[in-house]
Amino acid sequence: MSIEVVEVRPHERHFGVYALKFEDGSERLATRNLTPGKRVYGERLVKWGGAEYREWNPYRSKLAAAIANGIKFVPIQEGTHILYLGAASGTTPSHMSDIVGERGLIYSVEFSPRVFREFMEKLVDQGRRNVVPILGDARFPYQYAHYVKGVDVAYIDVAQPAQAKILADNADYFLKPGGYVMLVIKAMSIDVTAPATETFKQEINTLKERGFEILETVHLEPYDTAHAMVVARKR
Ligand SMILES: C[S@@+](CC[C@H](N)C(=O)[O-])C[C@H]1O[C@@H](n2cnc3c(N)ncnc32)[C@H](O)[C@@H]1O
């Protein structure tokens, strides 16, 4: 039998993020479900105060891991337009879709046709109208330049080498002046022989060289080994 939720309250720092409190005193992150009754990855749904919330699992979503680890600033709120590179089957994009609401947009780029089909089934076919699915390769932003309008945030989680470069190339095309980038660094996919901190430094240097001011870096352990999240702003 699952334990009961005894309180749902807004997160003290992040817009559109909630804390679910359980009867045993434990707490979990959640977002308010934009498509009530529908799940994306088997997450728990909680009805509270006339709304429905989706539990946000930090072991499944690196943005949730960064929030659970105390990231201070997430540049996402109601109405934010986001370019999401490496959308996979939509776990993190679905929570962003909850947060930005009907006035926001998540341009979601994924290059694997099989995974993209899952994304379509789980998000688009389920009625998330603020998601724009793009089957494309993030290394070649010109391929989808005609679909994407200026964005407030560019987010990357492609688990491939040269992520900072790919992110900066996309920012050159699509990021509005003063916009933000969020970079998930997976040390192993960049250089398996280098220690994680070395790899993190290299990727951060690439962002600095491309004109970004680094605002924050958060490690994602214990949720993800050798991963970090970097938030930066275009100077
Ligand atoms: C770690 S998963 C992303 C998980 C997702 N961000 C989430 O939190 O829900 C990485 C995804 O990036 C995709 N990917 C890798 N290289 C890519 C590229 N160059 N362009 C687009 N997608 C890419 C992979 O197919 C995979 O689905």
UniProtKB/Swiss-Prot annotation:
NCBIfam families: PRK04266.1-1, PRK04266.1-2, PRK04266.1-3. This is Fibrillarin-like rRNA/tRNA 2'-O-methyltransferase. It is an enzyme of class 2 (transferase). Its EC number is 2.1.1.-. S-adenosyl-L-methionine binds at T91, T92, E110, F111, D137, A138, D157, V158, A159, Q160. Interacts with nop5. Component of box C/D small ribonucleoprotein (sRNP) particles that contain rpl7ae, FlpA and nop5, plus a guide RNA. The keyword RNA-binding applies. Keywords: Methyltransferase, RNA-binding, rRNA processing, Transferase, tRNA processing. Involved in pre-rRNA and tRNA processing. Utilizes the methyl donor S-adenosyl-L-methionine to catalyze the site-specific 2'-hydroxyl methylation of ribose moieties in rRNA and tRNA. Site specificity is provided by a guide RNA that base pairs with the substrate. Methylation occurs at a characteristic distance from the sequence involved in base pairing with the guide RNA. It holds the Pfam family Fibrillarin. GO terms for molecular function: histone H2AQ104 methyltransferase activity; RNA binding; rRNA methyltransferase activity. The keyword tRNA processing applies. It comes from the Archaea. Belongs to the methyltransferase superfamily. Fibrillarin family. It comes from Pyrobaculum neutrophilum (strain DSM 2338 / JCM 9278 / NBRC 100436 / V24Sta) (Thermoproteus neutrophilus). One of its GO terms (biological process) is box C/D sno(s)RNA 3'-end processing.
